[in-house]
Regions:
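RNA pseudouridine synthases
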Residues: 1-196
């Protein structure tokens, strides 16, 4: 539309606008050493984020984030385009992330997240030799701004459940597969620390 690539299905057209239709993919290539686009359509972008990159902006870091990088990418097709955060991954966590291209999609994905993403598994290396081959950690986590506290009884925190399986032990470390029933801030870190 008027020499701008437009993928929005309900983009409002006005008399006098020049419209061209192409079956070719968007010519704006995306290349970034910390992000790889795995899937993209008019509603969402699915990326593989490498460790070391924040997923969203913080008070201290606005630009070196997946959110900022993807915002710059979608603005190449139209200056008003932007992306919307659906979920987060910690800076030192690599994995698959999903960002919405509009607020309606963001709300739909967030409101139905546990129905859409029913299996969340992580592979992690932890210090120490795990005593058990598998088990479940169940505790109540409370975000206390500077740290997240864990309690084995309901102390007003949020119930958090992590299932774990030891894949391998070597040289004082354990390779773990972790399956989350809940997705709380720092859940994996706090639950693994509680196991010793």
């Amino acid at each position: 539309v008027d020499n701008n690539i437009q993928t929005q299905y309900n983009f409002p057209l006005k008399p006098g606008m020049k419209v061209q239709v192409s079956r070719e993919k968007n010519k704006h290539e995306f290349r970034h050493p910390m992000l790889k686009i795995l899937y993209e359509d008019a509603y969402l972008i699915v990326v593989e984020k490498k460790e070391g990159l924040l997923s969203v902006a913080t008070d201290h870091q606005k630009e070196r984030t997946a959110q900022h990088i993807l915002n710059e990418y979608v603005k190449r097709t139209h200056r008003n385009n932007r992306i919307f955060v659906v979920h987060r991954l910690d800076r030192e966590t690599s994995g698959i992330m999903m960002y919405a291209k509009d607020e309606k999609t963001q709300h739909t994905l967030r409101d139905n997240w546990h129905d859409i993403v029913y299996d969340r598994r992580y592979v992690s290396i932890v210090m120490g030799d795990m005593e058990k081959d598998q088990g479940t950690v169940r505790s109540w986590l409370t975000d206390r701004k500077l740290y997240v506290s864990s309690s084995p009884v309901d102390d007003g925190g949020k119930l958090s459940i992590t299932h774990y399986r030891t894949i391998k032990r070597a040289n004082g470390y354990s390779l773990m597969e972790l399956q989350l029933e809940t997705g709380r801030k720092n859940q994996i870190r706090v639950h693994m620390q509680s196991l010793g």
